């Protein structure tokens, strides 16, 4: 016969079973909690599916937009343009006390190459925001220090050091190459020799041609870099440094091989000469000590990030060129850079060609 203590224990157990839910109920509540948490997190944060994507795609619920406002920028152009747009957004947001967010397409272009840090704005969120479009010229103006509006989207092709040079250390950090990109470029440079010896001075050379060959003479009344300019630029470095090697990148490598004298053994033609490999080209240029550039924002950025001495093509348009309304040389090239004047009389250039004379709808930056 059970003792009184056993009977008491059985009675307590029966009462607990009566008032406590079964274990399966606890499992059900736990599953609901986990699913709910995942659902709400998924709505707020969508991670970019890439190994370089440290920022998240930011999704703000409609009633939780940043009260201090936010800046973004409309993406236009290729790599050089987007680097200029990113740096300008970075600087103007800091200057105006706003949060800065980049479009997902800009992240897809820059993040595989550089260690950028600005967060990405989800496209679904961007569509719900009442943006105020704000056009930027390609140079800093005083009014840009006090930009009105809470939700501002910049337009234009800004790529001028006048926007962001006061933040140069931070800009250099934003455009730090990923290790694997940098190491691939360095491996190429280590394999170069000048007359059988390892060079100590590397000069990156970027030759921009492409559609500029026809657009410059017909639309902008200007020229592209010719053989004479490149000879002068390279000779300047040969006179200043002992046994330099020139690392040539271009979107028209066939023209470079015909036009740049390589008989001295100090010229290396790098890359495949296609516009589809900008990451490799800019990485090579950035690992050099000095830079020679022709036209385009790509070359300007390569020189800016490299440091060292820079030689650029100057005075490449006629005095009455409409190019002067959208481009200021003093805002594009750092004061310490050295310009070599273009030959405006080179044959089959100014006023020739087969392109339509009608001015394009795009800003010149779209061609760079």
Swiss-Prot record:
<dbReference type="GO" id="GO:0008107">
    <property type="term" value="F:galactoside 2-alpha-L-fucosyltransferase activity"/>
</dbReference>
<feature type="glycosylation site" description="N-linked (GlcNAc...) asparagine">
    <location>
        <position position="315"/>
    </location>
</feature>
<dbReference type="GO" id="GO:0006486">
    <property type="term" value="P:protein glycosylation"/>
</dbReference>
<comment type="similarity">
    <text>Belongs to the glycosyltransferase 11 family.</text>
</comment>
<feature type="glycosylation site" description="N-linked (GlcNAc...) asparagine">
    <location>
        <position position="289"/>
    </location>
</feature>
<dbReference type="GO" id="GO:1904906">
    <property type="term" value="P:positive regulation of endothelial cell-matrix adhesion via fibronectin"/>
</dbReference>
<comment type="function">
    <text>Catalyzes the transfer of alpha 1,2-linked fucose to ganglioside GM1 and galacto-N-biose.</text>
</comment>
<keyword id="KW-0443">Lipid metabolism</keyword>
<keyword id="KW-0812">Transmembrane</keyword>
<dbReference type="InterPro" id="IPR002516">
    <property type="entry name" value="Glyco_trans_11"/>
</dbReference>
<protein>
    <recommendedName>
        <fullName>Galactoside 2-alpha-L-fucosyltransferase Sec1</fullName>
        <ecNumber>2.4.1.-</ecNumber>
    </recommendedName>
</protein>
<dbReference type="GO" id="GO:1903672">
    <property type="term" value="P:positive regulation of sprouting angiogenesis"/>
</dbReference>
<dbReference type="GO" id="GO:0010595">
    <property type="term" value="P:positive regulation of endothelial cell migration"/>
</dbReference>
<feature type="topological domain" description="Cytoplasmic">
    <location>
        <begin position="1"/>
        <end position="20"/>
    </location>
</feature>
<comment type="pathway">
    <text>Protein modification; protein glycosylation.</text>
</comment>
<keyword id="KW-0333">Golgi apparatus</keyword>
<feature type="transmembrane region" description="Helical; Signal-anchor for type II membrane protein">
    <location>
        <begin position="21"/>
        <end position="41"/>
    </location>
</feature>
<keyword id="KW-1133">Transmembrane helix</keyword>
<dbReference type="Pfam" id="PF01531">
    <property type="entry name" value="Glyco_transf_11"/>
</dbReference>
<keyword id="KW-0808">Transferase</keyword>
<keyword id="KW-0735">Signal-anchor</keyword>
<keyword id="KW-0325">Glycoprotein</keyword>
<dbReference type="GO" id="GO:0009312">
    <property type="term" value="P:oligosaccharide biosynthetic process"/>
</dbReference>
<keyword id="KW-0328">Glycosyltransferase</keyword>
<keyword id="KW-0472">Membrane</keyword>
<dbReference type="GO" id="GO:0006629">
    <property type="term" value="P:lipid metabolic process"/>
</dbReference>
<feature type="topological domain" description="Lumenal">
    <location>
        <begin position="42"/>
        <end position="368"/>
    </location>
</feature>
<dbReference type="GO" id="GO:0032580">
    <property type="term" value="C:Golgi cisterna membrane"/>
</dbReference>
<dbReference type="GO" id="GO:0001954">
    <property type="term" value="P:positive regulation of cell-matrix adhesion"/>
</dbReference>
<dbReference type="GO" id="GO:0008417">
    <property type="term" value="F:fucosyltransferase activity"/>
</dbReference>
<dbReference type="GO" id="GO:0021772">
    <property type="term" value="P:olfactory bulb development"/>
</dbReference>
<feature type="glycosylation site" description="N-linked (GlcNAc...) asparagine">
    <location>
        <position position="195"/>
    </location>
</feature>
């Amino acid at each position: 016969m059970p003792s009184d203590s056993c009977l008491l224990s059985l009675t307590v157990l029966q009462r607990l079973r009566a008032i406590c839910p079964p274990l399966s109920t606890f499992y059900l509540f736990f599953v609901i909690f986990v699913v709910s948490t995942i659902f709400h997190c998924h709505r707020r944060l969508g991670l970019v599916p890439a190994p370089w994507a440290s920022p998240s795609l930011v999704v703000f619920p409609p009633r939780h937009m940043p009260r201090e406002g936010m800046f973004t920028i409309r993406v236009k152009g290729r790599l050089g343009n987007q680097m200029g747009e990113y740096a300008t957004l970075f600087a103007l947001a800091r200057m105006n006390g706003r949060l800065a967010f980049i479009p997902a397409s800009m992240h897809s272009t820059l993040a595989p190459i550089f260690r950028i840090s600005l967060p990405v704005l989800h496209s679904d969120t961007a569509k719900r925001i009442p943006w105020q479009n704000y056009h930027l010229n390609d140079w800093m103006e005083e009014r840009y220090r006090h930009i009105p509006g809470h939700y501002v989207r910049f337009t234009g092709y800004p790529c001028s050091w006048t926007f962001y040079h006061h933040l140069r250390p931070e800009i250099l950090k934003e455009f730090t190459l990923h290790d694997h990109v940098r190491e691939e470029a360095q491996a190429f440079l280590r394999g170069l020799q000048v007359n059988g010896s390892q060079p100590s001075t590397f000069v990156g050379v970027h030759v921009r041609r492409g559609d500029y060959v026809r657009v410059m003479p017909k639309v902008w009344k200007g020229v592209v870099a010719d053989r004479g300019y490149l000879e002068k630029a390279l000779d300047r470095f040969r006179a200043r440094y002992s046994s330099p090697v020139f690392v040539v990148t271009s979107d028209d490598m066939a023209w470079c091989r015909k036009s740049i004298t390589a008989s001295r053994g100090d010229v290396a033609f790098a890359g495949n000469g296609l516009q589809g490999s900008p990451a490799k080209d800019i990485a090579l240029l950035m690992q050099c000590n000095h830079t020679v550039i022709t036209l385009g924002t790509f070359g300007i950025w390569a020189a800016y990030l490299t440091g060292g001495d820079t030689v650029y093509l100057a005075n490449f348009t006629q005095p009455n060129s409409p190019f002067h309304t959208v481009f200021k040389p003093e805002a594009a090239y750092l004061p310490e850079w050295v310009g070599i004047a273009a030959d405006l009389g080179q044959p089959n250039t100014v006023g020739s060609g087969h392109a339509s004379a009608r001015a394009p709808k795009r800003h010149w930056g779209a061609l760079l």
